[in-house]
């Protein structure tokens, strides 16, 4: 019988290198058990096939998980031309095979150009998007005919890093909600041969541009060695580095925490991270055009010296 785990309050962010074959939620739960963290959440699903950066938020850090979900991301995508699948990746069943035309680098670049910027993209039918309160993948697995939603997404940049027919590799930088599987599928159709994702790796998520990730295997080994894996957690403040910052004295922080609006013409307009003078994050707020700061999310039990 597995020993009962005693969970504890931990506050911070773990930069997990998700393995292939594991859902994002299963990866989160595995890490949460190893850390013995009471509360945890991830910052947006990676496909089971995908590997790479999955920021996991614990304790008070879960209050910014939604912000990280909406941030820019970068992927390395290995794409196979000439074969389509029902999932738009290598985990799916082949649907159709077509010959791959001779393609120069210039032809590929020209085909990629329309996919950069704000584009309309149809999600894969095997996706976690919900329709009628149910994930699309559940309907697809039952064999239902599905019309996946078309949404506007933003692709900031696409770099062709290698091509040896029928495989190519792309570095894609994009905004929230972009499906790289859909991008591969649509690129294949634009080339007239179809395509699917063979491998996908997320290399960074804003603001973690140069992440020092840890695998579940390394995390397990650390715990089994008797070390406290909580040392790996980044402080909540690490997830706030892209926000304009406001530092308030103890009196004003207390008023901010009570939900009072504060006004200062020097406050930068927009969403801001509010800190105490000792460097501890107090919360997130919104500053209007008149310099009025309104509390949005408050952090509890955090200090500047400890991540957890």
Curated annotation (Swiss-Prot):
Transmembrane segments: none annotated. Keywords: Isomerase, tRNA processing. The lineage of its organism: Bacteria, Pseudomonadati, Pseudomonadota, Gammaproteobacteria, Lysobacterales. Coiled coil: none annotated. CDD domains: PseudoU_synth_EcTruB, PUA_TruB_bacterial. Signal peptide: none annotated. GO terms for molecular function: RNA binding; tRNA pseudouridine(55) synthase activity. The active site is at residue 47. It comes from the Bacteria. It catalyses: uridine(55) in tRNA = pseudouridine(55) in tRNA. GO terms for biological process: mRNA pseudouridine synthesis; tRNA pseudouridine synthesis. This is tRNA pseudouridine synthase B. Belongs to the pseudouridine synthase TruB family. Type 1 subfamily. InterPro entries: PsdUridine_synth_cat_dom_sf, PsdUridine_synth_N, PUA-like_sf, PUA_sf, tRNA_psdUridine_synth_TruB, tRNA_sdUridine_synth_fam1_C, TruB_C. Its EC number is 5.4.99.25. Responsible for synthesis of pseudouridine from uracil-55 in the psi GC loop of transfer RNAs.
């Amino acid at each position: 019988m597995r020993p009962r785990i005693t969970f504890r309050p931990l506050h911070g962010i773990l930069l997990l290198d998700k393995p292939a074959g594991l859902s994002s939620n299963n990866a989160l739960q595995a890490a949460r058990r190893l850390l013995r963290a009471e509360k945890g959440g991830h910052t947006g699903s990676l496909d089971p096939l995908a590997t790479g950066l999955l920021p996991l938020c614990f304790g008070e850090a879960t209050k910014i998980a939604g912000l990280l979900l909406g941030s820019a991301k970068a992927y390395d995508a290995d794409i196979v031309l000439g074969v389509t699948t029902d999932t738009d990746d290598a985990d799916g069943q082949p649907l159709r095979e077509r010959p791959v035309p001779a393609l120069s680098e210039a032809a590929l670049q020209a085909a990629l150009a329309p996919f950069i910027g704000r584009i309309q993209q149809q999600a894969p039918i095997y996706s976690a998007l919900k329709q009628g309160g149910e994930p699309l993948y559940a309907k697809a697995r039952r064999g239902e005919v599905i019309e996946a939603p078309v949404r506007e997404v933003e692709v900031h940049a696409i770099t062709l890093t290698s091509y040896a027919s029928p495989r190519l590799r792309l570095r894609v930088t994009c905004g929230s909600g972009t499906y790289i599987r859909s991008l591969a599928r649509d690129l294949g159709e634009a080339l007239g041969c179809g395509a699917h994702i063979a491998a996908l790796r997320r290399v960074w998520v804003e603001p973690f541009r140069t992440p020092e990730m840890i695998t579940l295997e390394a995390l397990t080994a650390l715990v089994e060695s008797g070390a406290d894996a909580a040392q790996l957690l980044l402080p909540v403040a690490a997830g706030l580095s892209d926000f304009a910052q406001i530092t308030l004295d103890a009196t004003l922080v207390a008023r901010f925490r009570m939900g009072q609006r504060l006004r200062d013409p020097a406050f930068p307009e927009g969403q801001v991270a509010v800190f105490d003078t000792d460097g501890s994050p107090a919360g997130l707020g919104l500053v209007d055009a008149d310099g009025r700061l309104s509390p949005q999310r408050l952090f509890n039990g955090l200090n500047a010296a400890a991540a957890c």
